[in-house]
């Protein structure tokens, strides 16, 4: 099933918040993405109905396995693309912004080539090839 870019953004933000704070709250999602709380409520409802997240009434939000897989793929791409753009001389802020746009549409072949280029001569590898 093809997932929308906005849903990928929400899932990625949730993963980052979970890693940074240990929990996912709607208010934090709104702040991270620069959207309104009603927008978050609508997105959370749709993501829950699609099986990407779990949430009890007034309870914490957690990523379901399907949502985690998508979030991890997008976040890995984001990190690798940011590093690649910085390697090209792009400022960190601009690299982050551009990576956020590219991460959704880049082909697997191009992503692998970027990771291979970044990882040449490195011990700690960037990117993951487990995702298509």
Regions found by a protein language model. Name each.
Residues 31, 48-49:
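Alpha-helical residues within the helix-turn-helix
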